[in-house]
């Protein structure tokens, strides 16, 4: 509503500025207001109970039933605690009313008579003292003092002590009863919840699951450990047979064998016969080892005993009946059947065994190739479509049979075949021409071009096996092996440095001195010189100083003087 015109003119003519109170907000929505409390609200709001107190109350209830409470009212509590004192309260109030009425009558009578006027002032003071004493008695009667003498039933007192002082007046009896019932219900629910939790913990379901998982992992670890131990033993046998293979490659070949037999006589024939028996025995031992390994595996047992095995699923989870039958068969016959093979039948037997084993081999290779491929994450790369399966790669390599045979017939190590003349080696020139800047390299790979059809040399594959064995032995991470852990840490740091190099941007333009820290002396050993120049290059450098070149020592081996020194130059010596 707009103000009157006179008030508006007065405000315009008034030179005093209008200072409004920021608290006076004209808007009704944003003006500050005082909200009255509701009638059912109390000053003492019920605060939430913490988890510690809840657990403590539950433990007390489980320990002793005397701590269990019950819903009651303040009036009933007072009657239980001090019933006699409350019954005497009414009589005390009646006596106090009679005393007040009697004192008023005595005052009226004293004012009208002459006897009251003659009383001394001390009588008035005595009456006042008596009045104060009566008031004290009245207050004590209204609020009787608490004493253990008035309490006869201490169990009821202990049960009701928790509810004393929970409310302030007798008007809140109903509210206190409702709150008591709610608290009792909440405590009951909490108690049931705690019991359920304890029951779940006592069941031991999680403990049993973790033990099962641990036992499975332990069994897998033991199986892998046994496989590695078996592989090490096979490699050890392969290393021992390598010596025999090298000796066999040095034996006389068919073109020179009759000459050796003629010259050797009976002693040569007996040595050849004993050698053939040893080779035959070795072949039979290898066949027995192969049968033993194939017979222990359920997937390849049919290759030994001839019984067709059932097709296995991808998950390879044998049933209990299969395990029982396998256990019974293992108990009845723990070893594969013995074979009686002649020496001339062994090559055919090995070829047939390889053709039968190839199906199982391809299945295992394909399965583990897919598992490792998924685990390594190679499927997610962009060029995954161009990758071929492991079986396709093997077939592609085996297609070139001539190349594979030529690699096994290549002489890779240095040894001399008996009865065969060695080829003359190309001499390496001792002196170099004057204008030659590149030193000739020795023909170190010349023996790789020497192909002999009568030998079998697989040194490249043998060296690869040895390299893998040494790497696995040296990089086996033992928790107690600090050296291996240090090597692994250095390898990881090296890979990290390759990924992201740390560049000091403030070290450019000569703002930081560049230096290399010399390594510490180990057992008083001189530091190793990491210079790229060898001794021959240094010698050639020192000899070519000051325009002179000395190719040999002494005048008899030839001196090649350089150009004459300029006049006035200082003499020099080498």
Curated annotation (Swiss-Prot):
Alphabetical list of InterPro entries matching this protein: AATF, AATF/Bfr2, AATF_C
Keywords annotated in UniProt: Nucleus
Subcellular location: Nucleus, Nucleolus
Region Disordered, residue ranges: 82-205, 302-340, 553-574
Pfam families given in the database record: AATF-Che1 (PF13339), TRAUB (PF08164)
Function of the molecule: Part of the small subunit (SSU) processome, first precursor of the small eukaryotic ribosomal subunit. During the assembly of the SSU processome in the nucleolus, many ribosome biogenesis factors, an RNA chaperone and ribosomal proteins associate with the nascent pre-rRNA and work in concert to generate RNA folding, modifications, rearrangements and cleavage as well as targeted degradation of pre-ribosomal RNA by the RNA exosome. May function as a general inhibitor of the histone deacetylase HDAC1.
UniProt subunit comment: Part of the small subunit (SSU) processome, composed of more than 70 proteins and the RNA chaperone small nucleolar RNA (snoRNA) U3.
Protein name: Protein AATF
UniProt organism field: Gallus gallus
Record lineage: Eukaryota, Metazoa, Chordata, Craniata, Vertebrata
């Amino acid at each position: 509503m707009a103000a009157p015109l006179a008030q508006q003119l007065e405000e315009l003519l008034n030179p005093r500025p209008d200072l409004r109170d920021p608290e006076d907000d004209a808007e009704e929505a944003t003006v500050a207001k005082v909200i009255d409390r509701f009638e059912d609200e109390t000053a003492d709001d019920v605060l939430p109970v913490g988890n510690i107190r809840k657990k403590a109350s539950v433990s007390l209830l489980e320990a002793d039933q005397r701590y269990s409470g019950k819903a009651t009212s303040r009036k009933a509590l007072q009657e239980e605690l001090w019933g006699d004192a409350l019954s005497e309260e009414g009589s005390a109030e009646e006596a106090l009313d009679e005393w007040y009425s009697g004192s008023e009558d005595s005052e009226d009578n004293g004012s009208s008579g002459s006897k009251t006027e003659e009383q001394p002032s001390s009588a008035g003071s005595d009456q006042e003292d008596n009045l104060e004493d009566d008031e004290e008695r009245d207050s004590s009667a209204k609020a009787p003092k608490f004493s253990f003498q008035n309490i006869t039933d201490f169990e009821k007192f202990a049960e009701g002590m928790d509810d004393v002082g929970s409310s302030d007046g007798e008007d809140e009896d109903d509210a206190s009863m409702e709150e008591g019932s709610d608290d009792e219900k909440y405590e009951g629910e909490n108690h049931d919840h705690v019991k359920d939790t304890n029951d779940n913990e006592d069941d031991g379901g999680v403990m049993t699951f973790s033990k099962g998982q641990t036992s499975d992992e332990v069994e897998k670890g033991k199986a892998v450990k046994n496989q590695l131990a078996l592989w090490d033993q096979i490699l050890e046998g392969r290393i021992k047979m390598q010596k025999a293979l090298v000796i066999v490659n040095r034996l006389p070949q068919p073109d020179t064998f009759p000459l050796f037999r003629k010259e050797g006589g009976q002693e040569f024939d007996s040595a050849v016969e004993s050698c053939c028996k040893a080779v035959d025995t070795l072949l039979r031992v290898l066949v027995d080892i192969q049968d033993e390994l194939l017979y222990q595996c359920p997937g390849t047992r049919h290759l030994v005993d001839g019984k067709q095995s059932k097709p296995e699923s991808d998950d390879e989870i044998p049933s209990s009946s299969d395990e029982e039958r396998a256990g019974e068969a293992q108990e009845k016959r723990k070893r594969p059947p013995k074979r009686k093979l002649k020496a001339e039948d062994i090559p055919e037997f090995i070829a047939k065994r390889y053709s039968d084993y190839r199906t199982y081999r391809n299945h295992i290779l394909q399965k583990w190739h897919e598992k490792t491929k998924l685990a390594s994450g190679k499927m997610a790369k962009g060029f995954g479509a161009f990758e071929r399966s492991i079986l396709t790669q093997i077939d592609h390599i085996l297609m070139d049979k001539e190349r594979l045979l030529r690699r096994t017939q290549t002489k890779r190590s240095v040894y001399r075949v008996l009865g065969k003349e060695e080829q003359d080696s190309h001499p390496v020139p001792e002196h170099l021409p004057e204008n030659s800047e590149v030193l000739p390299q020795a023909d170190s790979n010349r023996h790789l071009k020497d192909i002999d059809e009568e030998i079998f040399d697989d040194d490249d594959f043998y060296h690869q096996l040895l390299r893998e064995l040494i790497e696995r032995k040296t990089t086996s991470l033992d928790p107690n092996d600090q050296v291996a852990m240090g090597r692994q840490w250095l390898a990881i740091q090296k890979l990290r440095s390759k990924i992201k190099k740390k560049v000091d941007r403030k070290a450019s333009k000569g703002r930081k001195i560049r230096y290399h820290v010399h390594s510490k002396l180990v057992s008083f050993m001189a530091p190793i010189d990491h210079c790229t120049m060898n001794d021959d290059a240094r010698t050639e450098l020192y000899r070519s100083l000051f325009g002179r070149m000395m190719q040999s020592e002494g005048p008899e081996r030839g001196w090649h003087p350089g150009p004459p020194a300029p006049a006035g130059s200082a003499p020099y010596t080498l």
